[in-house]
């Protein structure tokens, strides 16, 4: 009875946030419910088939793909809009369904996983992101490892071409290891298990302690991040009985095309070295706008810019804007790449003639500001 009353109150707060304050209200119900009923996560998760998705990059798009596959089995709810902290998970669980697919922030995975006891956890990747909050990658990997040890009945699905994902899966009792032929990891010089230097042979690694990406249960061809996440989504969904579905890779890219007075702009989300590298590889236009902010959700520390090669932008017309535009412009200058700093995105986009096609790589806050405007 107390839980039901708490849910009613939480929903009223959500209604007030949406209708009166004109806000999204996606996390307010969950935030209120956790205050009123701290054990809401575990209670709402009872007798439900739950799948969790976590990783530095690709969580939202992969969650959408898993949800699409799972929905063929029965009623399904998801937080695929990106509200991935514990309060977002609770808000989603407040909706009735047989299946629940949750995107979960890397640091919040411990609480959500241990309280919901999911059928499946898909671990996509792990790399430096929001250093002021995440600190070192190894810290998050150790947390994931403890989760794997604590949930013997949960099946862990992971891309072990990432040594940090491999570390977590090594401790899982039930797991499906996946390899896409290997790829270099910028943070993978040292073995996250024993601290010795990893031995890399082309794109594959192994350590004397036994950590390796070779001998995965499922060995697939290499491809883009969207391609990899599409396969991981189908593998995770198959654990609970879903049949593989065709997934258009473009659907998994965090990109939107918008028109600005005749200028077609392809907006792509970039928030850390891995996502920047992926986005840069997808730049097809000769006109590019780069937007860098450094707010809390973007990551206050921008030192990671020096981990990225911008060579693919050489000889293109590059405009740089955002709160930390000078940091980015200087980084490009050091690599010998010319750019122009412009005060705002609105002024930058107007510098291109009508019918132009422009690639826009934008920080988290800038991306969603443009998408929602």
Residue ranges and their predicted role:
Residues 4-176:
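Phosphate-binding loop of NTP-binding sites
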Residues 102-129, 168-224, 252-253:
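Extended acidic/charged loop-beta regions that coordinate divalent cations
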Residues 103, 124, 157, 229, ...:
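Residue-level signal for inorganic ion chemistry
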Residues 185, 263, 269-343, 365-366:
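Active-site beta-alpha connecting loops in nucleotide-dependent enzymes
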